[in-house]
Each structure stands twice: as C-alpha cells, then as structure tokens.
C-alpha cells in the first residue's frame, strides 16, 4: 500500500481495519485535491477557480436512510426520532465497507470537530473521492501540521458513495446508508455523493456527547459585535442562518453548528456550507465572493457550457445548490471560532403561511416553547422526497434530524442558559408576507436586516410593542427605516378574513404539534403557547 502526505505512522489506516488498499493520500491540501479530482473526472473547474461537482441522484440529505446502533450504551437515545440497527447488523455493514475499500485509492483527513480545545472531537475521515476530502477539510477545523504526526482519532468516518448497502443483510431501508455506532465512534456513509452527509454526521456525534459535559450543541449560526455582544441564529436549512450571520459590521463565528459551554460560544466547524440558489453579488457580496475563488467547492451548481461561469439562478439540478468555503474567505470572520456568552438569541422561521410578523420579542418561556416547536417551512431540495413547494414543518430544536437525545435535554439547557446570562430572545420570519406561499412574496432581506440590526444594537428595546392576539408575543409597532404596515402582517394581506382564518389554522397546528411536549415542560412554558381558545373558535 502506497501512502503519501503527513500522518501518524503509528496509527494508520490499518488501525481502522482497512487493508489491501491501493493508495492512501493523507491530509492533502486544496491544490493536490483539485489535481486528483480533475484528473479522475470527479469535478470540473469553474471560471473563477471553484471546484464544481455534481452529486447525481442525491442532492440533499436522506434522513430516512440514517441509522444508529441500539445497544446498552444508547438507551438514552431519543428513539422516537431515530432509527435503529443492531450491533450485529452494523458489524456486517462495517466488514462489507472494509471489503469494498480493498484495491481502492482513499483520501484521509485528520481534523477537529469543535474550536474549543476542551470539547473538540478528533475526527479522521476516509473518502474515496478527492472532492469529498476537500469538502470535509474545508468544513471541519484543520490541525497545525505538527499535530498531525501524533494525531489519534476519537471519531472515524468512512465515506464511499460507490458502496451499496443490502437492506436485508444490514437492516437498513435502501442501498443508501448513514450508520452510526456511538460506542465505537464509527460512522459509515455509502450510496450518496452528497457531501453534506459527512458534516452532519460529525454534528450528530457532538449532539450526543456534549450535553453530558455541560455544552449545549446548537444548529445555529453566530456572530459577535464590536462590543463583544454575541448573537446566535437558530434555523433550518434555507431560513437565512448563513445569509443573516454574514454581516459586514459584525464578526462571523460560524454559519451552522455551535456549542454553548461554560466559557461562551464556539464553532464546531472551520468552513461554511451556504445555499447558493439565486446567489448574487448585490444581495450577498461576502458569500458570492467566497464562492467564486480557488478552494471553494460548488455542489450541483450549473456552469455555462462555454465560459464555465456559475449560473447561480439555475435550479435545474436542484434548488439545494451549495457552496462550501473556508471560514477565512469571509473577510470579517473570527480567527478563533469562539465568542463570549450570547446577548441575543434569534429563532428564524420561513413561515409559508405568511402570518408571522417579521420580528417578535419572546419571553424566556416563549423562547423555550418556540425552540421545542421549531416551526419553519421545509424548503425544496434540502432533503429527498420534498416537492417544489415549501411545506410547513415543526422540527424540534430547529434540528430534529440531528438530535440523538430527547429534545427536552436541549430545551432545558437553552432555558437555563438564557436565564443565567439574561439573554434577549427574538422570533424572525424570513418566509412570506402579503399572503401564503404562492400568493405573497418572500420577506425583503433589507427589512429583515434592518430589524435584526435594531434588535442586536439594543435600539429595538426602546420602541413601542403590541401583543400579538394570535401568538401572544410582543411585536414592534414602528421602527425608523422600516415600513410600518409590514410589521403587522394583517396589513399586508388584501383579504383580511383569509388572514384571520390562516392565522387561526397555524395556531391550531402549533397546539397539535406541542401536545407531545406538554408533559415535559412546566406551567410557564405551557402558558406561552398560542391561545387554544382562539384556535378552536
């Protein structure tokens, strides 16, 4: 077996059971990985230097194909939200992965999940594709060269899109599989070329281990102002986490995954993974610039046949086009990935019904209610099985597919942290205004940015608020620079009776969804629910 690159010779591929490999390329950088990827025909070069790859059948995550080993160590798992396989089935899958790898050239990266040295997880990722190796090297945190000589992984991932699972033998649903064994700290990914499965496997692992160490893992972006005022933005894919946290007046901590621990907030990653459908220089200059340079990886972005210039408006392959780039491609990104305890928590919802206000102030009890509810609209393309229209979705903790533990674990941690650090909480609608999806229009990003700026700099505390009669939270009535009519969504609808009917229906959906949490929360949180009587009228 031929090996190249810097590595720990005493802890190589054989320690994972990989044998009879053709080659292993260790910890290669972008230039070498570009070379291997282009030579193998895995990807093409865009006009501006980004590497552009097509993921084929799978253009998003496939949560129905994700499985966790059920054994004595995982009885604390939230099995209502996770699928299980036996240790024996996983072992058969593992052995078949090892057999499939024989004779292949693999790329290995030694990386960290987590910017806080106390809580990070040492992660080794084996991939059969060079561009997947570049992707995960970009998304996680790279050790210093000197650390690679003695690197011993805690978590190992093997990612082979050419592998096909056997549902009968392996206890899975299809030929596509993501399988996690928390006891052995092994993740197996097969059948899918969608690179996002790798990063979310690391996130799921951190979601499992960190709470017992006093760290709340969060599906959120984060930034910090010049006065050290950290803000975190919860939200599902497509709700604006990446876009809204990339603010030229604030330092970006990260765009997707963070921990909130004893010393503040820290990024789990060293890169960004931005949705780039309809990406433009005018609306998102930082992300546009980062996506159009050497070292960026574009997924399913259509290139002009002659010029090779990316056409970010073209969603013919998928609406879930993506750009992965190093965090330091954003000019004002943090170099440490760490920040003080938050002053503001923002929950982003892409409301497909168009009845939530553009911003609302939440009490601590309302914050826990909306965190456990995790309301948004699933946006087309981020998962398999969705159509072209957004669907209303309650994804608890704004990240249900990535939660190995009961949602109440994360909800209680958030409530304690909000109380301990006197945090202001906000609900922001980045979805529709002036009607439902199909009738109304998307909330103008300039309005959202203006409202967020006012919330984060403290000026929103000084305006007049009204109590929303449907949801009970506080909504500003006026703010300089923002049209007053947009602050009260009913004013943006031509048909007021239809608005009332739609708002009542959404209240009912919240109530129905939250029923499963009522026994786990106290009276304050139950009282923070939208008005039950109103929904039943």
UniProtKB/Swiss-Prot annotation:
Catalytic activity, reaction form: oxaloacetate + ATP = phosphoenolpyruvate + ADP + CO2
Disulfide bonds: none
Annotated localization: Cytoplasm
Required cofactor names: Mn(2+)
Entries under Pfam families matching the protein: PEPCK_ATP
InterPro entries per UniProt: PEP_carboxykinase_ATP, PEP_carboxykinase_C, PEP_carboxykinase_N, PEPCK_ATP_CS
Origin: domain of life: Bacteria
UniProt-listed PROSITE patterns: PEPCK_ATP
Protein's pathway: Carbohydrate biosynthesis; gluconeogenesis
Residues that bind Mn(2+): 200, 219, 256
Binding, ATP: 200, 219, 235-243, 284, 322, 448
Record-linked Gene3D superfamilies: 3.90.228.20, Phosphoenolpyruvate Carboxykinase, domain 1 (3.40.449.10), Phosphoenolpyruvate Carboxykinase, domain 2 (2.170.8.10)
Manganese in keyword set: yes
Family: Belongs to the phosphoenolpyruvate carboxykinase (ATP) family.
Family annotation (NCBIfam families): pckA, PRK09344.1-2, PRK09344.1-3, PRK09344.1-4
Stored PANTHER family: PHOSPHOENOLPYRUVATE CARBOXYKINASE (ATP), PHOSPHOENOLPYRUVATE CARBOXYKINASE ATP
The protein, known as: Phosphoenolpyruvate carboxykinase (ATP)
Name of encoding gene: pckA
